[in-house]
From Swiss-Prot:
Ligand binding (heme b b562): H83, H182
Record organism: Ursus thibetanus (Asiatic black bear)
Name of encoding gene: MT-CYB
Protein name: Cytochrome b
Taxonomy of the source species: Eukaryota, Metazoa, Chordata, Craniata, Vertebrata
InterPro entries assigned to the protein according to its UniProt record, in alphabetical order: Cyt_b/b6_C, Cyt_b/b6_C_sf, Cyt_b/b6_N, Cytb/b6-like_sf, Cytochrome_b, Cytochrome_b_C_euk/bac, Cytochrome_b_N_euk/bac, Di-haem_cyt_TM
Family: Belongs to the cytochrome b family.
One of the protein's GO biological processes: mitochondrial electron transport, ubiquinol to cytochrome c
Length: 379
């Protein structure tokens, strides 16, 4: 009798994705982040669901309902902090996952890569709207500043912003609709992640060497299930440490003050995972130019496959490109630091230089390095 996991219509899908899937024999820990992102997403959906049971999306009671969750709901504080810090873990895994794709040339699997970019935008939108929900000072002013960027769009800008707000400022209507979107988007992300996997399994995974691995495949289970389990354990350990020892480490103290439209906080800034994009936005004096740079800072990922000039897929054997890649990482860390600083000398000029360097590395230096390395390999 044939094993049920290979014949049952539903079990067959799971079997072909998680058990009998042929995987390259040499994929490193950098390939763990896909499963970790899946775990983060499930964790966020579950903690979010329990938070939604006690949260009220009304401007007058939203802040109090979050305080009520932390004080009066059984283990409400741990659910709330797991959700807030789970988002940080989600973004750490996302950045690692995208960085791995850039380093090892995984962007050449174009369908998977493009769905990944859509996923990145969707997760960023979800995180932004989630940050508005506690209705603290930074929630309110963050929502005001970021939605206001759309007013830079010529002709329809102002109307568009007021349409999103549901009035003439960020108010009750804005909070209610943000809650509705924040609730539905994770399920859309889940569906997109399934499509992401579907496209990946059409071609199979890339591997660190960048050489096709069809001649050397191993079953996903038990080799990579146990490897993913170790990664999951380490992620849970990191998250638990953060939640139980310093839950407010990555948050903003201003968000413990209820939203007040009459008092602007001295420094409006988003959560840490948006600071690099926020720094790029601020480094351009023109409003529309800043918005375009902000969008393009993420959208640039879509043209990376077109700029691939090297004969080799990954950067494993390309020292010039490796140097540029790590320079890019250092540049992004610099931008993240600048995004959290006030707009004054010397931070303005550092931010502008870091922004120029970011686009220069990706659009100019990396393609040139690929060509140089092709020529060097002829020697």
């Amino acid at each position: 009798m044939t094993n049920i996991r290979k014949t049952h219509p539903l079990a067959k899908i799971i079997n072909n994705s998680l058990i009998d899937l042929p995987a390259p024999s040499n994929i490193s820990a950098w390939w763990n982040f896909g499963s970790l992102l899946g775990m983060c997403l499930i964790l966020q959906i579950l903690t979010g669901l329990f938070l939604a049971m006690h949260y009220t999306s009304d401007a007058t009671t939203a802040f109090s309902s979050v305080a009520h969750i932390c004080r009066d709901v059984h283990y409400g504080w741990i659910i709330r902090y797991m959700h807030a810090n789970g988002a940080s873990m989600f973004f750490i895994c996302l950045f690692m996952h995208v960085g791995r794709g850039l380093y090892y040339g995984s962007y050449l699997l174009s369908e998977t890569w493009n769905i990944g970019i859509i996923l990145l935008f969707t997760v960023m939108a979800t995180a932004f709207m989630g940050y508005v929900l506690p209705w603290g000072q930074m929630s309110f002013w963050g929502a005001t500043v970021i939605t206001n960027l759309l007013s830079a769009i010529p002709y329809i800008g102002t109307d568009l912003v007021e349409w999103i707000w549901g009035g003439f400022s960020v108010d009750k209507a804005t909070l209610t609709r943000f809650f509705a979107f924040h609730f539905i988007l994770p399920f859309i992300i889940l569906a997109l992640a399934a499509v992401h996997l579907l496209f990946l399994h059409e071609t199979g995974s890339n591997n660190p060497s960048g050489i096709p691995s069809d001649s050397d495949k191993i079953p996903f289970h038990p080799y990579y299930t146990i490897k993913d389990a170790l990664g999951a354990l380490l992620l849970i350990l990191a998250l638990a440490t953060l939640v139980l020892f310093s839950p407010d480490l990555l948050g903003d103290p201003d968000n413990y003050t209820p939203a007040n439209p009459l008092s602007t906080p001295p420094h409006i800034k988003p959560e840490w995972y948006f600071l690099f994009a926020y720094a790029i936005l601020r480094s351009i004096p023109n409003k529309l130019g800043g918005v375009l740079a902000l969008i393009f800072s993420i959208l640039i990922l879509a043209i990376i496959p077109l700029l691939h000039t090297s004969k080799q897929r990954g950067m494993m054997f390309r020292p010039l490109s490796q140097c540029l890649f790590w320079l890019l990482v250092a540049d992004l860390l610099t931008l993240t630091w600048i995004g959290g600083q006030p707009v004054e000398h010397p931070f303005i000029i550092i931010g502008q230089l870091a922004s120029i360097l970011y686009f220069t590395i990706l659009l100019v230096l990396m393609p040139i390095a690929g060509i140089i390395e092709n020529n060097l390999s002829k020697w």
